[in-house]
Amino acid sequence: MLPIAIFIIGPTASGKTNLAIKLRQKLPVEIISVDSALIYRGMDIGTAKPNHEELTQAPHRLINICDPAESYSTANFCLDALNEMTVITAAGRIPLLVGGTMLYFKSLLHGLSPLPPANVEIRTLIQREAKAVGWAALHQKLKKIDLVAANRIHPNDSYRLLRALEVFLVSGNTLTEMIQKSGNALKYQVYQFAIMPVNRSLLHDRITRRFHQMLANGFEYEVSQLFARTDLNTNMSSIRCVGYRQMWSYLAGETNYHEMIFRAISATRKLAKHQITWLKSWQNICWLDSEQQDMALNKILQMISKHIS
């Protein structure tokens, strides 16, 4: 019989952390963070990282494991998460994976697609071409190579455009073809739960309120500490995190304060929309209303308790 694991997946600002902490008080679970922003040290406010009290009450694994200058791939996550899950299961407890980085969840669940590593030489060639003809022209080029990927990638999303073209030039296979080749499936009996408000406007309101609270909590100072470093720039995954790249742009004098706020909130809403789109196509998942936390908690307990008694 396979060991049990629980996934709580949801868009940003949907109340995942709060639900996970409540669940830890009821079940023998250990929390593993599934969030590509929470891995970074010194990036606490803008990532809505659980505070000291919450982490004392319910420790989260895979938080604060990287410096913002370090790279951390999906493959790194899968290896780290599997290691933590093995340790937790061996201790007779249940891994509870919580977060909103959908690619991490998907890769862990179905196995990592064998994508080629980044190739500096190829990337430089693509970036030179983009500088000469523009990213919109490269998006049209991608349409001829991989229409499925091109339809998923916005013409202004230079990072994902670059990666899709790079994969093709390095491997000779399209990104879509490579993604369809999955590795080994997760050897756990996984119970998956999606949490979000029934009404999308509630999520938008929560995102807006949360960002203003981040500002009140010292988000500008937090980013200014990163901005002052000489080893960080906007090409890095850490600084591309939602909120950070907009504040970075403000600190660089590229936009004013009010525009920064507008862009950060808009980008966060866009991220939430993207996360929800992923979830809508997710298989074998139980939906929970984030505005009914006690009901959501009871639903999880009902499903899990009969399998651990």
Swiss-Prot record:
Its cofactor is Mg(2+). Substrate binds at T12, A13, S14, G15, K16, T17. Coiled coil: none annotated. It catalyses: adenosine(37) in tRNA + dimethylallyl diphosphate = N(6)-dimethylallyladenosine(37) in tRNA + diphosphate. Pfam families: IPPT. It is an enzyme of class 2 (transferase). The keyword Cytoplasm does not apply. HAMAP family: IPP_trans. This is tRNA dimethylallyltransferase. It comes from Baumannia cicadellinicola subsp. Homalodisca coagulata. The gene is miaA.
